[in-house]
UniProtKB/Swiss-Prot annotation:
The keyword Metal-binding applies. The lineage of its organism: Eukaryota, Fungi, Dikarya, Ascomycota, Saccharomycotina. A zinc finger (RING-type) spans 1294-1336. This is Restriction of telomere capping protein 1. Residues 1-39, 559-593, 600-619, 630-651, 736-766, 788-831, 942-963, 1014-1047 are annotated as: Disordered. InterPro entries: WD40/YVTN_repeat-like_dom_sf, WD40_repeat_CS, WD40_repeat_dom_sf, WD40_rpt, WDR24, WDR59_RTC1-like_RING_Znf, Znf_RING, Znf_RING/FYVE/PHD. Keywords: Metal-binding, Phosphoprotein, Repeat, Vacuole, WD repeat, Zinc, Zinc-finger. Residues 753-766 have a biased composition (Acidic residues).
Length: 1342
């Protein structure tokens, strides 16, 4: 609300100097900078030192007039030059401001600068309209107080050389100095001046007050009294009514303190009492009626607080607040007002006393971590606000414990500040925490509550003034402690404040100005704050941050009061209970206390002394009677009992959190550009994936969040799947046992039925195994393996349904029964496998399963952003890992079967399709072709149980290779020649070496590796079969007899094995993972046969003359593979006693065990992918490969891997991906990944008992040696830092379970007790406890 020019002109009293506008220091003249000529170079400043009351030497230096750099008045924090002045913009227009005339000599450049700054002010900002009074005095000011007379609009201001009475006029809004009690008038004689200060000489330098210069005024009968420090240890009392030149205004001087006085105060109920406190840590109470002489060096009551120096001391106020209702009017008061007082000390302690029991304080609170500087009582509730050097303003409840529940207030979500718990020295002391803490950025030297009644403490207003250079007075509402309600700006730093009434507040500043504001006309900080703010982000300057929040309020809704009785009329808000002089026969409060506590033995309590004969001009009686003191309370005691407001617990005010929106400017601009291009080309809006492609930063963030970098944390997921799998197996065993039990009571029909039952059990078992592996591998339903397994189930069902139609001869039935019994025997022997080897193999399998799952997940992540290149890379890695997993699972299952096979069992030549290519070849016409069923087995070896191995009679031929070999040109012989014997001997030796090497490595021997030959026991002549009709019949028959060969073994089909056999030159083995000792290289001879053909490459040569040469090429790769345990070697179907040719035997004799890794080898493949990623700069893929495969395949040097991961961590930190960086460090397989940077974040633990550094190296070496001797790695779990080797004692135990704290530890901040995370969670969350488990008082958890 703006005012008219008349009002603005009227606000400036005639003859006074208005406050200038804010200007740059460089534009102020020399005289203006130094201040008025009447001001001394030594300016006053209040000092707060615990050891001395003397001023600092630095305080004698005049400081320039400073203005705050930032202000709340214009919304967000704005520079001083851009903000709206809260004390001149509404009342002092620039053309009317006299201060502007003095700056007329300023340059045009400076004037232009002022105009520019004024134009920069936000037009939406509400300007200040609350500044009503302002004046500048010629004397230095340090303290201010109001005259407690409602008929006089008076203020008292004091300084070193000034004690003045000022009156303000609401009509013309002026402030005038009525009388100066130090500087005499022109008509005052020297003698009169000397009579004012009898103990001072006539020299000017002695006409000064103490550096403390606190000033207070009396109440009721003593409302005309002014108390001020005459010197450091004396209090002078002046009479306001004696302002003429002939009267001596000095009433008396109170001097008993041995050190400087810091504070004093008048009692509002017993107005004849005055209390003082100083550096001597003593509280002294004076009765003005007993001190009628001009000087008194003896107090009525002296209390030694036995603490540090007293900074501030205050009586409990005794306001009478009037309230009207239907029945009339009533008043609210406090029965304890005349007896209670409090003091705050340099040590930060807050002490509360009762005058009726002065020997012991009622409460002792540790209010501040540093020196406490000031305190103030709430007008009508037993709360005290304290301010300290630590920059905190705390609200404390100091009422009786019995009434604590009635006065309990909510904290409204504000956690209390941490204070050091202390134990009170008296029985009534209690451990307490502040109800509210307001954090400021400066020491708080002055604070005062608004003198208004409030039933809810949070609806109270509190004015705060600082000790620093903040040129402002902040008014806080306790309902909103973070944002002040009003910020009243002044030209220079504020020195003090006083509330005149509920709406008017005055302050003084270092610029010797007195300012007065009407807070009802002053804008709140929230009104000037911007409702939404936008600022640049700190990271690289490429983003915006916006915050939007509702305004809220500064008040808490409270119910209306319903008074029930009233006996008095409405009074002035500032009036106090008027005690009656009453009956002189009774004693006053001081007399009653002296009689009641004469037996307490208080050393500082002095006995009653005889009254002085000389009476003062304003004192009629010696002391106030007890009846008069009691009557002041009895008049309203009845109404107080029923009308005292009770503060009720209410629900917290829900303040919605701010909504934060982040914007990435480069991405926004890029999206705008792409949108315009798409619109011009009439395309739709780009998808999220395409926008991610155009923003490399977002793509990197997305990949870092979605990709999996470590298989260590995948064990938890796999463990849960394994648990479910084990539960399923247990359920199967239960069903089997129940079936077997039931089967014992029945009769079995025949052996074939038993075999069928076993097959059914195996099918149920295999079904669960297959579903479990499918879940682990994350295969889709249309995957090749899933299709084969589903087809196997259908074939099994159809086989059982059509078993009656099949025709078996006696040999087939016997072979089937013998195979079943052999499988059962082998299953029993498989239980005797070495447990260590089995556990090691299971661990390798689990690692491969986790890596396959991660590869599948990473591939899907790249597919979601249409990155097909990296998608194919991860699919290739997954297929390679599947190959390794297939070999491990198959070798584990079939290892015992291979060791128990008979030497005369036959083996068919295996041929199949490539698993990794996944191509399906069309079937060719002709009698020499075979279907797709002949190229792959019904169920892969990895999914097949030992007992489910088909017999020779049930096996179908894989191809017509045997028929082709029968038609080859052979030479029968009766005795093998030397060349053939040498070849066979060589093959035998190589097989034995292979078996020994596998046994030493602790691995199971697969039947694909060992070739058993028995030339002396089983020798059968192979008969020629030339008829083409026989070949057709061979494929048509469901059960075909195999060709008799010299070497026979149990047939074993594998889908993945066909991958290597489908190459044009046959199968080439592979070396083991990470085997660096194999120096064997392959010899590949590719032919011109189309890879689409389903039959073997040898079949296409069946009708040519080069059949023997083709077989020689095939036979050149039949040598066993040494050091290649992962792949089974291919070998011919039979080695008969027929000698094919001399060239063939020579070729076989010259065969070498030189076979290198095939192209699909996992280690070789991953190394190539790593090199490609480093060359192309694919950071994510490079780091991902190092994380997953470095420890398994040794992709690169360990130092290079650590350096790459360290740079990747820095990149994550740069893009604020701190959570992912923490996971990378947590699951990284390497130690000291950050190198030298990691040493900077090391944590040193010290023993709580002996104080030594906890290293525990001796116990670590002892446990390590024990672990090496016993081979038990779990022994190292005993090592930790929860004990100390130096003192041989444990550190802090859990407060709940009292066990050592070894892992995650929680600390209860209020009391410092520690406990396990599970224990603390159970105590506070599960059991809903709020106190500490150790029994500490106070609420520890809200």
């Amino acid at each position: 609300m703006s005012l008219s020019p008349h009002v603005e002109n009227a606000s400036i009293p005639k003859g006074s100097t208005p406050i200038p506008k804010n200007r740059n220091v460089s534009s102020i003249g020399k005289g203006e900078f130094l201040g008025s000529s009447s001001s001394n170079n030594s300016s006053f400043r209040m000092n707060h030192y615990s050891n001395s009351g003397q001023p600092s030497v630095l305080d004698s230096i005049r400081r320039p007039n400073l203005t705050p750099t930032f202000s709340y008045s214009n919304g967000v924090y704005m520079p001083e030059s851009h903000r709206t002045s809260s004390f001149n913009d509404s009342y002092l227009p620039y053309d009317k401001n006299p201060y502007a005339k003095t700056t007329g000599s300023m340059s045009n450049k400076s004037n232009m600068k002022i105009k520019t700054k004024k134009n920069a002010i936000n037009t939406n900002t509400r300007k200040s309209s609350g500044l009503i009074y302002t004046t500048k005095v010629d004397k230095e000011l340090s303290s201010i107080d109001k005259v407690n007379d409602p008929n006089i609009n008076g203020l008292v201001c004091a300084g070193k050389t000034h004690l003045g009475l000022y009156k303000f006029s609401p009509s013309d809004r002026s402030i005038k100095c009525v009388h100066d009690f130090i500087t005499p008038n022109s008509n005052t004689s020297t003698r009169g001046t000397t009579s004012l200060l009898p103990k001072l000489s006539k020299r000017t330098r002695q006409n000064k007050f103490s550096t403390i210069a606190d000033v207070k005024t009396g109440f009721n009968n003593y409302k005309n009294c002014i108390a001020v420090c005459n010197n450091s240890t004396a209090i002078s009392i002046y009479d306001l009514n004696k302002s003429s030149s002939i009267d001596n205004p000095l009433i008396t001087s109170l001097c008993e303190h041995t050190r400087s006085i810091n504070s004093f105060d008048f009692n509002m109920v017993e107005s004849n009492l005055i209390i003082s406190g100083g550096q001597d840590s003593c509280v002294k109470i004076w009765d003005l009626r007993s001190n009628k002489s001009k000087s008194s060096n003896r107090s009525d009551i002296s209390i030694n607080t036995a603490s540090d120096s007293i900074r501030d001391v205050k009586w409990m106020p005794g306001y009478n607040f009037a309230s009207k209702n239907d029945q009339g009017s009533s008043t609210y008061g406090n029965l304890k007002s005349g007896y209670k007082f409090a003091s705050i000390h340099d040590s930060g302690y807050l002490l509360k006393f009762d005058l009726r029991q002065p020997a012991q304080y009622e409460k002792k609170l540790n209010a501040h971590t540093g020196p406490g500087l000031c305190l103030n009582w709430h007008p009508n509730q037993e709360y005290i606000a304290t301010g300290g050097r630590d920059g905190k303003c705390c609200l404390w409840f100091v009422g009786d414990n019995a009434n604590a529940a009635e006065n309990t207030v909510l904290n409204y979500g504000n956690s209390p500040s941490l204070h050091v718990p202390n134990t009170s020295l008296n029985n009534s002391g209690s451990l307490a925490f502040p109800k509210l803490t307001i954090n400021t950025d400066y020491p708080v030297t002055k604070l005062k509550f608004k003198p208004a009644y409030s039933s809810n403490i949070y609806n109270s207003l509190l004015g705060i003034s600082s000790m620093g250079d903040e040129a402002e007075v902040r008014i806080y509402s306790l309902a909103r402690k973070y944002i002040p309600k009003h910020v009243l700006l002044s030209e220079t730093p504020s020195l003090g404040l006083v509330w005149w009434d509920e709406n008017l507040i005055f302050n003084i500043d270092k610029g010797t100005r007195i300012n007065g504001w009407d807070i009802n006309k002053e804008p709140t900080v929230l009104e000037n704050l911007s409702k939404n703010t936008t600022t640049w982000r700190d990271l690289d300057g490429n983003g915006l941050l916006s915050v939007d929040q509702e305004i809220g309020s500064y008040e808490v809704v409270e119910p209306e009061l319903q008074p029930t009785s009233s006996t008095t009329c409405k009074k002035h808000p500032g009036t106090i209970k008027n005690p009656k002089n009453g009956n002189p026969e009774n004693q006053g409060i001081i007399g009653g206390i002296k009689k009641g506590f004469s037996h307490t033995g208080l050393t500082s309590f002095t006995p009653e002394r005889p009254p002085t004969l000389k009476a003062g001009p304003t004192f009629s009686t010696k002391s106030l009677t007890l009846a008069s003191g009691a009557s002041s309370f009895n008049s309203s005691s009845a109404s107080l009992t029923s009308l005292t407001p009770q503060t009720e617990n209410r629900e917290e005010i829900a303040i919605e959190p701010p909504c934060i929106i982040t914007l990435d400017i480069p991405q926004i601009f890029n999206n705008i550009r792409l949108t315009k291009i798409a619109h011009s080309r009439k395309k739709n809006v780009i998808s999220e994936s395409s926008s991610m492609k155009n923003s490399p930063v977002e793509k990197f963030k997305y990949l870092a969040r979605q990709l999996k970098f470590s298989y260590i944390r995948e064990h938890n997921v796999s463990d849960s799947a394994d648990t479910a799998y084990k539960n399923d197996i247990e359920n199967i065993d239960v069903v089997k046992n129940a079936t077997e039990t039931h089967g014992d009571n029945t009769t079995t029909t025949n052996n074939n039925d038993d075999g069928d039952d076993d097959d059914d059990d195996d099918d149920d078992d295999d079904k669960i195994i297959e579903s479990h592996l499918l879940k682990k591998y994350n295969f889709p339903e249309n995957n090749t393996w899933a299709t084969l397994m589903n087809e196997k189930v259908n074939n099994k069902k159809s086989k059982r349904n059509s078993s009656s139609s099949r025709e078996f001869d006696e040999k087939d039935v016997r072979s089937s029964i013998s195979s079943i019994s052999a499988s059962r025997q082998s299953h029993d022997r498989s239980r005797k496998i070495d447990k260590n080897v089995e556990a090691e193999l299971q661990e390798k399998i689990q690692t491969l399963v986790d890596l396959i799952s991660i590869a599948t997940h990473n591939a899907s992540v790249y597919l979601s952003i249409d990155d097909l290149t990296n998608f194919k890379i991860w699919i290739l890695i997954r297929d390679s890992l599947l190959w390794d997993l297939k070999w491990m699972t198959s070798s584990q299952i079939s290892s015992d079967n291979a060791s128990n096979m008979d030497a005369n069992e036959s083996s068919d030549f295996e041929a199949g399709e490539n698993l990794k290519t996944g191509k399906e070849f069309p079937e060719e016409d002709g009698a020499g072709t075979s279907g797709a069923e002949s190229l792959v087995e019904e169920r892969p070896q990895a999914f097949r149980a030992n007992s489910d191995e088909p017999s020779d009679a049930e096996k179908k031929p894989v191809s017509k290779l045997k028929e082709q070999l029968k038609n080859t040109e052979i030479i029968p012989y009766a005795q093998p020649n030397e060349d053939s014997d040498e070849v066979l001997t060589k093959l035998k030796e190589l097989q034995n070496q292979r078996l020994e090497s596998r046994t030493k490595m602790g691995e199971t021997v697969s039947d694909d590796v060992i070739i058993e030959e028995d030339e002396h026991e089983h020798q059968e002549e192979e008969q020629p079969h030339d008829s083409p009709t026989k070949s057709a019949q061979f494929h048509a028959s469901p059960i075909a007899k195999s060709i008799p060969i010299l070497q026979k073994r149990e047939h074993r089909k594998s889908f993945i094995d066909t991958f290597m056999l489908h190459s044009p030159n046959g199968y080439n083995g592979d070396t083991d993972i990470g085997n660096e000792d194999d120096n064997i290289s392959p010899r590949f001879t590719y032919n011109s046969v189309s890879p689409r053909s389903k039959v073997s490459s040898l079949q296409s040569y069946a009708t040519t003359t080069s059949q023997l040469e083709t077989f020689k090429k095939l036979s050149s790769h039949t040598a066993p593979i040494i050091g290649s345990p992962r792949h089974a070697p291919s070998r011919p179907d039979s080695i008969g006693r027929e000698q094919l040719s001399s060239s063939l035997t020579k070729k076989l004799a010259k065969c070498k065990k030189i076979i290198a890794d095939p192209p699909w080898d996992t280690k070789k493949l991953i190394k190539q992918l790593y090199n490609q990623a480093t060359e192309t700069g694919n950071v994510v893929l490079t780091v991902n490969i190092l994380f997953l495969f470095q420890t398994i395949y040794q992709i690169t040097e360990i130092d290079i891997a650590k350096d790459a991961i360290a740079h990747f961590l820095l990149l994550l930190h740069r893009y604020e991906l701190f959570g992912i960086a923490a996971d990378v460090l947590k699951y990284c397989p390497f130690e000291d990944i950050m190198g030298s940077e990691g040493d900077q974040s090391s944590i040193r633990l010290f023993c709580e008992r002996c104080g030594e550094l906890i290293t525990n190296e001796s116990s670590k070496e002892k446990l390590r040696a024990e672990a090496q001797q016993t081979g038990n790695k779990k022994i190292m779990d005993k090592f930790g830092y929860w004990y100390c080797d130096s003192c041989k004692k444990k550190n802090t135990s859990c407060v709940l379970c009292e066990r050592p704290l070894k892992k995650l530890t929680m600390v209860i901040l209020p009391c410092g007790h520690e406990g396990h995370f599970q224990c603390i969670q159970e105590w506070f969350l599960d059991e809903n406890e709020q106190e500490c488990p150790g029994g500490c008082p106070g609420v520890a958890f809200i």
